[in-house]
Amino acid sequence: LRHAQIGYNYRITEFQAAIALAQIENINEIVFWRKKSGKLITELLEATDFFKIQATPDYIEHSFWCVGARLKRDLKTWYKFRDYLFEKCGERLFGAWQVPYNEPVMQNGDFRRYLDSENNRIEYSKGLCPNAEEIQKEMMVFKTKYRNQESLDNFINGLEKTIKEFK
């Protein structure tokens, strides 16, 4: 099962803390590459007629943890696009597994043991957010993890080839 239970153990080991500290010390470079990657990916996807990108208002500066895009085609095409992209550049993209309240841990009610009695009556059922449930099936999530021009170019070239194949 995916996400079979919820845990609230937020402690980390010294090793994990050292990794986190190193990441924080490099935050400016990490964010620089995420923004650069995100902008390039967004431009490519927006130039097609089969992707819809969530709008970012002008007053917000996007940090691009990822680029989420809705593929306006059927599920069969979703899988073909994903596989073709991997073939062209060796990179995988993600899909939205399902909306969080449809995860097994929410559906089986195990999370309730962490709630006080007032919040224990909350119900999560399919159909709660029909728009999110519909969009979830069409989402492609593109990573922005690239930390140098060579790896970014590899992905962008693969994405360009994949888009041309599906036009």
Spans of model-derived segments:
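PLP-dependent aminotransferase class I/II
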Residues: 1-167
